Amino acid sequence: QIKELVTEIAELSDKVTARFDGNNTRRPSFGVAKAGEQPRVFFAGLPMGHEFTSLILALLQVSGYAPKVSDEVLNQIKGLNLKANFDVFVSLSCHNCPDVVQALNLIAIYNPNTTATMIDGAFFQDEVEQRKIMAVPMVFQDNEHIGQGRMTLEEIVAKLDT
């Protein structure tokens, strides 16, 4: 289903290309990147339901579409002095998850030292059990739990900017 989704999206525009040569350890998964760059935004599982908007926004923002956040917050994201991989575990029926996924995607898009991966817990039950995830969204930075539940972009950036 993921290959089908990615192929369909690529067929909608000549500005989108689908490649199937990734080496992400989580399968099924895919990354989103500007042409010529390595992906920093990843989706592990099928981003449907509430997460479909997260995928569309990632495609738009990677291509240069300006996000609806202040210049101050964007500059703060660009200035974050960190190298990090963020994982956010979600459920496709979760109402709070897209805001957190979209915030972390934006951080990965605007700060080249970061990556963000949305992980659909339904696809990765072993990892959910191993990390003892009982509620979503649950966020990890370099495999260390840093937050869960509803969080705004500004709250996440403030937490990272300490």
Name these PLM-found stretches.
Residues 22-41, 130-142:
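Structural micro-motif
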Residues 1-32:
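Oxidative protein folding and maturation machinery
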Residues 33-66, 140-162:
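Non-catalytic, surface beta->alpha helical segment in thiol-disulfide oxidoreductase systems
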Residues 1-5, 78-112:
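Local sequence-structure signature of Cys/Sec-based thiol-disulfide redox active-site neighborhoods
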Residues 65-80:
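Long, charged amphipathic helices and adjacent flexible linkers at domain junctions
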Residues 127-136, 146-152:
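Thiol/disulfide oxidoreductase modules built on the thioredoxin-like
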Residues 93-96, 131, 158-161:
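Terminal low-complexity, intrinsically disordered regions
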Residues 12-24, 111-128:
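Thiol-based oxidoreductase modules, predominantly thioredoxin-like and allied folds used
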